[in-house]
Amino acid sequence: MASRRNARRLEPSPPSGTAPTRTALITGAATGIGLATARALSENGWRVIGTALPGQDVTSLRDLDRTTVLEVDLTDDESLRVLLDAVVAQPRLDAVVSNAGLAVPGPIEGLPADQLRRQLEINTIAPAVLARALLPQLRATGGGMVFVGAGQGRVALPFGGAYGASKAALAALTDALRAEVAGSGVSVSLIEPGAVRTGILTDSTARGHEVLDGMPADVAGHYRAPMLATFQRAEQAFRTAAAPEDIARLIATILDTRTPKPRHLIGREARALALIALLPSSWRARIVQRLAR
């Protein structure tokens, strides 16, 4: 649940005649891309409202200037309500960065339904709920929304069907939202990174092992070898992955741009997936099937 004691008001508005301090809400701000973005915006003079899971280490986030931390479970309706109440109570809101994400790999046959549901709730539904609730504030300031998607939203990879589905759905939502708010002064951007050196890569591998170990033996037998090979490729990708600071700089640039591009590919893997997505479906299927071996 969002912590009410952390839902305090930010610093008072600046005196009349001075430039107002811009305010950004960043979800998943305790680590990785979220923390790097919070740091980049704070260093540029923004106020930051950063969310973190209850119990997460938020020391680095709290140490940033002009930053408020809210403990939030984005899958819990009451927790979301407390978050929204806290944000709406702020004097202004200039940006919403929907960054919080979850990846739990596994075959469709063996992935528990609750793990599929949770990825959709965090990666797709929560960003839509925040956008719906906070659009009035963003209209008032001519602000922007940045959604952190993934290259896998363009091409679904073996054992990443749930994650890819959640990011493909997020991309569809952002495309529709962008068209719906055109002319309102609110910008809507989707970032599609490939591999990034954050905890989501290592955490997803650990979760994938749990999924594999929890499958019935007759099901696991079909998938163990290719899943382990997938985890090995993920470890290799981690070594050459983009730094979270690269994504943070892009987000900061987007928020300083009046009319940013609708979509932003970043990283070698994301660009490769974007090219694969352009191929005829039969070619694309053969390439993806090779990754399931």
Give the role of each language-model region:
Residues 30-31:
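Conserved glycine-rich cofactor-binding loop
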Residues 107-108, 115-117:
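Substrate-binding pocket helix/loop in short-chain dehydrogenase/reductase
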Residues 99-104:
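Conserved NAD(P)H cofactor-binding loop of Rossmann-fold oxidoreductase domains
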Residues 131, 166-169:
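Active-site helix of classical SDR
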Residues 183-235:
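C-terminal beta-strand-loop-alpha-helix "lid" module of Rossmann-like NAD(P)-dependent dehydrogenases
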